[in-house]
Amino acid sequence: MLERIVLGLGSNKGLSDEMEFEPVQILKMAVIELQKIFLPKDFFYSSVYKSKAMYYEDQSDVFNMVVSGFYDGTPQELLHQINEIEANFGRNRLNEFRNGPRTLDIDIELFGEKIVSDANLEIPHKKIKERQFVLIPLLEIFPKCAEPISGVLFSDILAKLPDQGVEFFCKLDL
């Protein structure tokens, strides 16, 4: 069954190979890769926002955005696909520390109206309601979106959060 998915993307660490890719370039390339796993119709992506890192602050600013599209598969299948995309952009889950710098971090924020609580996956994302860096870009593309468990509008949740210094950075040109 087709489900509308919302993914949160973040990057604050460049990728070196033959070329140097900065975080915003990584986000742009990740959006292009993510378009391949979603149905082509009704694929949306937000602007890029910049903020200080949360939880572990001794690192570079983080660039965040959300993407949304329709997906024909299970949450676990999607998790596997996004983990592969993260790895292709240099993420090594075995050699990183929690909330540390990332070349690319992709979180499943929403999977239609599904509620999932597994050992390796929680949907809606367990921290979505505390993260302005997710809520601001989410509301940019879906201003009337509601939290599926409580039904509370994300705009109302955002209004109650303290300022976390999330700033508009740029629109991507794909």
PLM regions and their residue ranges:
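Short beta-strand-to-loop capping motifs
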Residues: 11, 67-73, 110-113
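Generic N-terminal amphipathic, Lys/Arg-enriched alpha-helix
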Residues: 7-13
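Extreme N-terminal starter segment of soluble prokaryotic enzymes
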Residues: 2-6
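Short, surface-exposed acidic-centric catalytic microdomains
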Residues: 23-75
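Flexible, gly/pro- and Lys/Arg-enriched active-site loops
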Residues: 54-62, 76-80, 84-174
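Acidic/polar residues at beta-strand termini and the immediately following turn/coil
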Residues: 15-16, 147
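Residue-level signal for inorganic ion chemistry
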Residues: 12, 45, 137
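Short, flexible/disordered intra-domain loops and linkers
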Residues: 17-23
